[in-house]
């Protein structure tokens, strides 16, 4: 008994001495500038709720204001979760070039855990997952490759002509640019994917699909107590996971109906000419055993959820800035007119060759990025260091693209709409800025492994839509409104949109 007591006492003494030695070494490493780093600075968190009360207003603007006080690499406590916010081009460069692999996972919003969605979606699967690599390869090879997009160029041109054709019927009247363009973009995407218009059609399932996807994204974009306090997830106190699960079930049912009918058509009529759309390609992959059948449904949902908002919102912001800046409007319309000569038709290749138009597109994406806050990253390993601060494993990393692309250290007159800034880049000896995330002051589509896979479609379709609208119509503000009267207030919801939808009057300048 005495021996046991002695051993326990010696063990306790050894444990205490080891702990004291560890604390001494740790203190000395901090004092001597060792590699044990602190978290970035940030606003003082309140008990339990952290910094949640600091985040009112427009989210990306609020984060930018906080960064001006606490620095371009900043810590926020969001309830019981820790986030590091990156707000400068230099900090973004360091994060993406040195730690892209360690930051290649995503934190999953609790609402998207419904129906196992997060486990099958390319958006939330970690890049180390073989499933993610397979899906990424499908996007790159069968959906957004130059060859695949070129094959469906005629469909995109036809759908953009449909937009122009509809606007001709209301020429001279005030119209909501967002609504008209959104319908056209939905049809462009849906016809490219499965040869069906999703807007202004008689199909109840088509209209229902559009509305449900919008509801799902709006629900997930809202604040959820389960994301701030993970121990409450099981309770789903706001019911957002249940609501999302219900909507996802309906959407997947509608998509599955479209897919199953096509698969039955392919099976029952093997000699019938195929549609030549993306759905045909995906069904071929599933039939060959290269992807499971359910991946087709998830791929279609991911593209619809992200694609329509991105293209519509960029067109609206670009049109708003052109109406607000008559000099730029006149210059880009002159380029379009001169390039076409006396031709009345306009195609996607024409838009790609117009230098100033491309500058307008890039500047609209810089000043008003649709994803003002990029889809957050998650540190999956220790060892991440940004700006001299530690980003521990399990930390959410938020890239404020809106702040990065207005960083005064990287941009001259960053808050002004100046397409010429990209023109000057083209004419200088340095390489022109591109959309693909290699220029870290300009990341509207993200960067690294998680670069938006739909970028190739957007960079073709958006300038083409813009050029078509500018070629076919002279655009004016409603009666009595001057450019200075325009409301350019942002609203951050599912995307960074105009708080007041743009209203404008198209006046026909060409006939088809």
From Swiss-Prot:
It catalyses: ent-sandaracopimaradien-3beta-ol + reduced [NADPH--hemoprotein reductase] + O2 = oryzalexin E + oxidized [NADPH--hemoprotein reductase] + H2O + H(+). Its cofactor is heme. GO terms for molecular function: 3alpha-hydroxy-ent-sandaracopimardiene 9-beta-monooxygenase activity; heme binding; iron ion binding; monooxygenase activity; oxidoreductase activity, acting on paired donors, with incorporation or reduction of molecular oxygen, NAD(P)H as one donor, and incorporation of one atom of oxygen. The chain crosses the membrane at residues 6-26. It is a single-pass membrane protein. GO terms for biological process: defense response; diterpene phytoalexin biosynthetic process. It is an enzyme of class 1 (oxidoreductase). Its main location: membrane. The keyword 4Fe-4S does not apply. It is found in: Membrane. Keywords: Heme, Iron, Membrane, Metal-binding, Monooxygenase, Oxidoreductase, Plant defense, Transmembrane, Transmembrane helix. This is Oryzalexin E synthase. The gene is CYP76M6.
């Amino acid at each position: 008994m005495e021996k046991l007591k002695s051993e326990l006492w010696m063990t306790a003494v050894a444990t205490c001495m080891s702990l004291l030695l560890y604390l001494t070494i740790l203190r000395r490493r901090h004092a001597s500038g060792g590699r044990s780093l602190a978290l970035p600075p940030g606003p003082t968190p309140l008990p339990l709720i952290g910094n949640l009360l600091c985040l009112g207003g427009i989210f990306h603007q609020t984060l930018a204001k906080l960064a001006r006080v606490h620095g371009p690499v900043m810590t926020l406590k969001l309830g019981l979760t820790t986030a590091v916010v990156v707000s400068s081009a230099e900090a973004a460069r360091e994060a993406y070039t040195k730690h892209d692999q360690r930051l290649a996972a995503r934190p999953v919003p609790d609402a998207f855990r419904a129906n196992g969605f997060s486990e099958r979606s390319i958006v939330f699967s970690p890049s180390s997952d073989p499933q993610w690599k397979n899906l990424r390869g499908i996007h790159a090879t069968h959906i957004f490759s130059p060859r695949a997009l070129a094959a469906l160029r005629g469909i995109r041109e036809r759908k953009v002509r449909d937009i122009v054709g509809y606007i001709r019927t209301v020429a001279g009247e005030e119209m909501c640019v967002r609504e008209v363009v959104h319908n056209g973009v939905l049809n462009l995407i849906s016809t490219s994917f499965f040869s069906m218009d999703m807007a202004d059609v008689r199909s109840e399932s088509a209209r229902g699909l559009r509305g449900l996807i919008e509801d799902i994204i709006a629900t997930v974009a809202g604040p959820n107590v389960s994301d701030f306090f993970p121990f409450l997830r099981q309770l789903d106190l706001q019911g957002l996971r249940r609501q999302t699960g219900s909507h996802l079930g309906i959407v997947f049912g509608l998509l599955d109906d479209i897919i199953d009918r096509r698969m039955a058509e392919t099976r029952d009529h093997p000699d019938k000419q195929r549609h030549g759309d993306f759905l045909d390609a995906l069904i071929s992959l599933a039939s060959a055993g290269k992807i499971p059948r359910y991946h087709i449904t998830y791929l279609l949902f991911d593209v619809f959820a992200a694609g329509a908002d991105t293209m519509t919102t960029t067109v609206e912001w670009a049109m708003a800035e052109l109406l607000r800046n008559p000099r730029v409007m006149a210059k880009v319309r002159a380029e379009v007119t001169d390039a076409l000569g006396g031709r009345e038709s306009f195609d996607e290749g024409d838009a790609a060759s117009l230098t100033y138009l491309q500058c307008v597109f890039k500047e609209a994406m810089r000043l008003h990025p649709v994803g003002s806050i990029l889809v957050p990253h998650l540190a999956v390993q220790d060892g991440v260091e940004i700006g001299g601060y530690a980003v521990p494993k399990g930390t959410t990393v938020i890239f404020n693209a809106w702040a990065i692309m207005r960083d005064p250290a990287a941009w001259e007159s960053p808050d002004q709409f100046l397409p010429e800034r990209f023109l000057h880049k083209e004419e200088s000896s340095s390489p022109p800025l591109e959309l693909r995330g290699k220029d870290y002051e300009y990341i509207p589509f993200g960067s690294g492994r998680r670069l938006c896979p739909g970028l190739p479609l957007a960079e073709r379709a958006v300038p083409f839509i813009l050029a078509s609208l500018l070629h076919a119509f002279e655009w004016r503000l409603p009666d009595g409104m001057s450019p200075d009267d325009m409301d350019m207030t942002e609203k951050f919801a599912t995307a960074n949109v105009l708080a007041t939808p743009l209203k404008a009057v198209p006046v026909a300048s060409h006939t088809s």
